[in-house]
């Protein structure tokens, strides 16, 4: 059973680069289980992609491959921009009754921390190689980002409990965020203000 799930996950299109097939026009006709399954597959792929990019970024930094590290950081910024957009627009408001406003505030503050960590990583990659200390600083930031991915992925346990209309709103918000394609800084400046 687990192998079938992994196989299905591997065969699904990468949600980082391909929006879903017009979910806004047809999703209402599907049952809750189908909607939930589609949402969880897309969320899971996104979190896996982010995890993989962060782990590859750490490897690139350890190998001194700054060009690859900068390329991976661009992917991370794009993922975070779209992901944080639909999380703050639809996921977090839908979970308010489960976790309360204080936890919602902490999750939103975690997005601010991610922005600071990504900026620090960019700073490390924009300067001349600084040796072991610079690499260790980068690794600490990457590890903190990996923990944030793991914590956010855990929200899927609560998303599973949401009613169909909330699931549809999350899928629609996700689709809009992917179509807009704002990176982390654009989202923070243009959308959050």
What residues fall within each predicted segment?
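Small-residue-biased structural context
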Residues: 1-193
